Amino acid sequence: MYLKDIIRGVKDMIKIDLITGFLGAGKTTFIKKYASYLMKQGRKIGILENDFGAVNVDMLLLQDLEGDNCSLEMIAGGCDADCHRRRFKTKLIAMAMSGYDRVIIEPSGIYDVDEFFDALYEEPLDRFYEPGNVIALVDAGLEEDLSKEAKYLLATEVADAGCVLFSKCDEVPEKQLKATLSYLNQALEQVHCKRRFTLDQILCKSWEDLDEADHKRLLTCGYRM
């Protein structure tokens, strides 16, 4: 199919949500909840596993979501960064003809959010897609001895997020929540980002306890630039 045919076939801009978080933060479990809510609202969604590894275990964990209103796609890893970016762009172009209302992207645990926005503003993706929500998951018991590179990535993941969620918050005391929040703000300061968070701005809840108001908050949280 030619690109001009794809462009004609896309009637409305498709929103893309990016779900970020380090390995173990609970991205896959959260996506199952989030995607299930979207499907209950009658949305047709595509989930794209943008994995830099050679084997994608998360894809297996999400398989029970597949059906008429949900499809799973994957970008295979095992290549260099430039090759992976090309595959990412090609996959999104192909997905534009699938009639999705929304696409959810789960990148690997190491991902620069700027690359997400850079890709969406390139042609021809800017004709098909627009940024939806950027949701950042942070382990409430986050270790406070991250490497300089990991701390930078942590800051980039939350800096543009429309909503930050603390995962496993029911497993740690409030003192630890405050310590994680402080570490998060330190990471932002070190990359010269002016944004800071207070605890009441963080969605701190077990995924099982998310209610209608929480889902609406997530669905409309957007992103910050």
Enumerate the predicted regions with their spans:
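Conserved beta-strand/loop subsegment of P-loop NTPase cores
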Residues: 46, 130-138, 158-169, 188-207
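Charged helix-capping and loop-helix junction motifs
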Residues: 149-153
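Nucleotide-state-sensitive switch-loop elements of NTP-binding domains
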Residues: 14-20, 25, 29-147
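Short, Lys/Arg-enriched N-terminal segments with co-localized hydrophobic residues
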Residues: 1-12
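C-terminal accessory "lid"/substrate-recognition subdomains
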Residues: 8-9, 54, 172-225
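A short alpha->loop->secondary-structure connector
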Residues: 123-129, 154-156, 181, 185-190
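A short, aliphatic-rich alpha-helical micro-motif
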Residues: 97, 155-158
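Short histidine/acidic/glycine/proline-rich micro-motifs that form metal-
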Residues: 143, 170-173
